[in-house]
């Protein structure tokens, strides 16, 4: 499949508008509204031009920096592509970023104009404004935001856009299109960092061009697809994926609030979505729980359908073999009846492709998703590689548990400590203002050091763990915590888990229960409790969870298995510094915050 449009990001939307005209490009909800609305390619293109003109009118110049501090929304895309049109670099901030984080990024990135989403983001921006010498204006997407008294720097997006409404500077904009270079910087993406060290990854238009071309060869997205956003546009996975889908003429459905994703899916019936493994873990838990509670006949039918789906989609298709005619016919019937009902409950009547990355994917979950007829494409990537390094190629055989084959532009080398090293046109030139770090992150042959351990086998890449996250027990055994944690996260009673093992005699875990279900279980078993603290301290509850964990970890070597657990009465959170903006756990912070609880598990 050839990419339908090959364009520099500065003119991509306008070229697509010339091709698709009044077809729907974007579907979204306005802030505070429950009603879905649509924008055509022509309208999208006009808005982008208006943003380019308005930016010039407030004084933006080529190579200036703007930042977007917002949830996903239609204005986000207008702003990004409007900036690209005049060679302005756009820096995305996570909507959940703290004042301290945005102040650091604004100053490090020398941001002149900050676009914010809702009240929370505006309030934080207003409070740090005086501490950010480069910052000149705050432009607010949501018109219902209350602007602080005497804030001459603030401007609503609806008023900002009027400055470019009649395209007063379009001649200058067109001239800037002509001078667009692949070497210009499109974005600086600040990594949230599991160690707390935030670095600005420089991404050029050339990297985007190479990434779009390489992904286009292996990801079957077309103008027929309806693609819903789940991850924030700040996340390189969602950003790269959204741009790929737009470049193919697909309709983009913008989901603003992650907690509404399942409701949104049932309303708009997407064919594609990128996500992290936790989304599919929760789907797996919910579907399995529903079927286990169903009547015996229904339960039997479901598990038979799952077995047929597994045989056809994994034993044959994934292994590059053609299914026998009898199996194909049985699958056709089961797929149209039972499996389609399961997918319908998710809003996925016509699933096409569902890229999944960002954390370790449990083989159990991957098998389940493929078995019910959803094209999950497991992959691996980094901000520094502009997302995809490797992914499952659905037209080739693949192994459950791998992260697929490298995309065409990437060279992979396995270095010391089994570190994955990368080279190619999608790889960053380095971190903004970090010359010392940049000198260390590339080897003598120019390969980028990922910090991830892995290995190649039969052309496929397998991940082991972040090197800095690998634990070594006091007995000298290595533990990959993410793999152990992913086994536990498929249990309906477990919400969060942090494995402990470094320099310890055995493996233990801090566990945050799924409180609603554990509370129900406790009541059914006549266990009295007056608080979550009571529940977490209860020996029967701990015994029940330890027994379930023992079942889940049977496949692990004995030294990898969790021997003791501590239940925590509250969640790991971003506010406490225990989670990154991408919801990965910060192990050093967790070790520090729960030092007493951890030490207690190792008392003789």
Language-model regions: role of each:
Residues 406-473, 490:
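Conserved ATP-binding/catalytic segment of the ANL
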Residues 471, 496-499, 505, 542, ...:
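Conserved C-terminal "lid"/linker of ANL adenylate-forming enzymes
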Residues 49-50, 182, 201-222, 230, ...:
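Conserved structural elements of the adenylate-forming
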């Amino acid at each position: 499949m050839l990419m339908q449009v090959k364009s520099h990001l500065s003119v991509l939307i306008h070229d697509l508008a010339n091709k698709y005209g009044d077809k729907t490009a974007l579907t979204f909800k306005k802030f505070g509204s429950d009603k879905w609305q649509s924008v055509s390619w022509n309208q999208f293109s006009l808005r982008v031009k208006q943003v380019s003109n308005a930016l010039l009118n407030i004084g933006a110049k080529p190579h200036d920096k703007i930042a977007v501090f917002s949830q996903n929304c239609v204005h986000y895309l207008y702003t990004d592509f409007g900036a690209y049109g005049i060679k302005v670099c756009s820096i995305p901030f996570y909507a959940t970023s703290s004042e301290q984080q945005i102040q650091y990024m604004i100053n490090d990135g020398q941001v002149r104009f900050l676009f914010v989403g809702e009240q929370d983001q505006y309030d934080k921006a207003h409070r740090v404004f005086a501490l950010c010498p480069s910052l000149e204006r705050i432009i607010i997407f949501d018109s219902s935001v209350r602007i602080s008294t005497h804030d001459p720097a603030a401007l609503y997006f609806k008023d900002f856009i009027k400055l470019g409404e009649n395209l007063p500077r379009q001649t200058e904009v067109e001239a800037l299109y002509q001078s667009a270079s692949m070497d210009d910087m499109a974005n600086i993406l600040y990594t949230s960092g599991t160690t707390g060290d935030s670095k600005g990854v420089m991404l050029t238009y050339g990297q985007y061009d190479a990434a779009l071309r390489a992904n286009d060869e292996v990801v079957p997205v077309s103008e027929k697809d309806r693609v819903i956003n789940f991850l924030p546009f700040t996340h390189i996975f969602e950003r790269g994926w959204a741009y790929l889908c737009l470049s193919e003429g697909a309709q983009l459905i913008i989901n603003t609030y992650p907690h509404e994703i399942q409701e949104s899916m049932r309303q708009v019936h997407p064919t594609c979505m990128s996500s992290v493994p936790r989304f599919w873990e929760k789907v797996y838990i919910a579907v399995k729980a529903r079927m286990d509670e169903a009547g015996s006949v229904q339960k039997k039918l479901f598990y038979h359908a799952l077995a047929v789906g597994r045989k056809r989609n994994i034993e044959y298709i994934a292994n590059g073999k053609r299914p026998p005619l009898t199996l194909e016919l049985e699958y056709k019937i089961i797929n149209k009846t039972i499996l389609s009902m399961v997918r319908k409950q998710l809003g996925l009547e016509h699933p096409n492709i569902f890229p999944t990355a960002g954390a370790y994917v449990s083989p159990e979950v991957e098998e389940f998703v493929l078995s019910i007829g959803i094209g999950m494409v497991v992959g691996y990537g980094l901000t520094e590689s502009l997302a995809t390094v490797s992914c499952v190629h659905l037209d080739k055989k693949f192994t459950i548990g791998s992260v697929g084959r490298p995309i065409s532009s990437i060279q992979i080398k396995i270095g010391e400590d089994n570190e994955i090293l990368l080279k190619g046109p999608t790889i960053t030139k380095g971190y903004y203002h970090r010359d010392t770090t940049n000198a260390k992150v590339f080897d003598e042959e120019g390969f980028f050091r990922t910090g991830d351990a892995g290995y190649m086998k039969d052309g496929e890449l397998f991940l082991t763990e972040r090197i800095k996250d690998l634990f070594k027990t006091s007995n000298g055994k290595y533990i990959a915590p993410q793999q152990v944690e992913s086994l536990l996260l498929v249990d309906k009673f477990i919400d969060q888990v942090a494995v402990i093992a470094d320099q310890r005699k055995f493996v233990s875990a801090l566990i945050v229960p799924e409180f609603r279900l554990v509370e129900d279980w406790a009541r059914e078993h006549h266990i009295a409790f007056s608080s979550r603290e009571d529940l977490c301290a209860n020996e029967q509850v701990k015994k029940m969870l330890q027994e379930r964990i023992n079942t889940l970890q049977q496949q692990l070597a004995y030294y990898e298995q969790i021997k003791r657990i501590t239940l925590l009465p509250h969640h790991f959170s971003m506010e406490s510094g225990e989670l990154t903006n991408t919801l990965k756990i910060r192990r050093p912070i967790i070790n520090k915050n729960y030092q007493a609880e951890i030490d207690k598990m190792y008392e003789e």
